[in-house]
Amino acid sequence: VVLETIAANLGSMATPIGNPQNLYLYSVSGLTAGEFARAVLPYSAIAFGMLMVIVFTQREVPLLDVVVKEKSDRLKKEILRGLIPYLILLGLCLLVVLRVLPWQPVLVCVMIVIFVVNRKLYLSVDYFLLLTFLCFFIFIGNMKRIPEVNELLIAMVQGRELLTGILASQVISNVPAAILLSGFSRDFSGLLTGVNLGGLGTLIASLASLISFKFFAREYPNQKGRFLKVFTLW
């Protein structure tokens, strides 16, 4: 699970849709696909090589026994049919990210389709997380309106985007760090690399780490300490 978490953090940095911070920074920065690739692909390639070395050199000792339940062919077909609307919506969203379609009509389309297909999904949305992001935008806007604070933060961040992104991610997680720091720098390539590499630090440094720990703790509550120990060592 720990290696999967590390792989998720490092692998997700390779594309604009790989993780929330990439999606946000790609949308606000105006970076082209080529500029984005030059910023993150070298690190992704190095990370892939290191993970392959670890996978093929470590002893094959499973952390815990996992039981996989086999699904019937009928159930598999039902699941596939149910995925079709979501795959279509995913395609539309990808076109928005690629700046082929405007986001406004796609947003309306997604909301209507979800309401028709599975309106219960609206009850499972993490509205607190969305509100947190909204508060970050408001906070950044307020800080930029205070000349002294704005100049101080710009002086702290500009020219140090990589290091600042890594350090800030350890404290407030990399998605909030990306949102916060983007208001005080124009070096989006350095910031992009910093918040992605910063996700490998503490448990709270990335949403992927928090999510994996949450699911692990729910399934194996007596093994939480072991997970934290292994995660910290890696």
Describe the residue ranges of each PLM region.
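Membrane-interface helix termini and inter-helical loops of multi-pass transporters
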Residues: 22-37, 64-69, 146-156, 178
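Generic alpha-helical transmembrane segments of integral inner-membrane proteins
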Residues: 45-53, 87, 91, 134
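Transmembrane helical segments that form the transport core of multi-pass membrane transport proteins
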Residues: 88-186
